[in-house]
Amino acid sequence: KEKQRGRKKITIAVLVSIALCIIAIFTALFLLPINIAYEPVKIDFPFEVEDVENVEMYHYDGVPASAEKKVVVAENDIKTLYDKFKGLSLKDKTTEETAGADVTSFRFNLSDGTSYDLIYACYGVKNGELKSEAGGFKYFTSADIGSYWNNLNTELEAIPINESELP
């Protein structure tokens, strides 16, 4: 009987230890906040700033039918845009998309007759997505790229456009 009691105590102790280990693992994996460090990435344009003839900027708040366009032709403004995008810190992670995003797009028209589009969708404060079909990327950014629309050159005229013109 003494041996049986000893075995029962050992068995119970082992089972309790296993249960505590399972609880600890579960807590570590599922209940503690997981902080994944995403490596920052940069845009690598397949062209140089000197190759850009002009940049068409498009913007709408939530509804594409309300889109407007500005055309950037001044070399300084083109260089400013180019450099801002080259210097952005982007992350290769998904964003939580919501309907009615504010969208600001940029079409870099190049001297060889081609163009390169960047589309920025803002889903909330410091929560945006920058994508390019030609560049083959879709990155998260906390940068306020939408502010380029208002702040680049306040003298640029915004004209209403048809939704079909959007990148």
What positions do the PLM features span?
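Function-determining sites in protein domains
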Residues: K3-P167
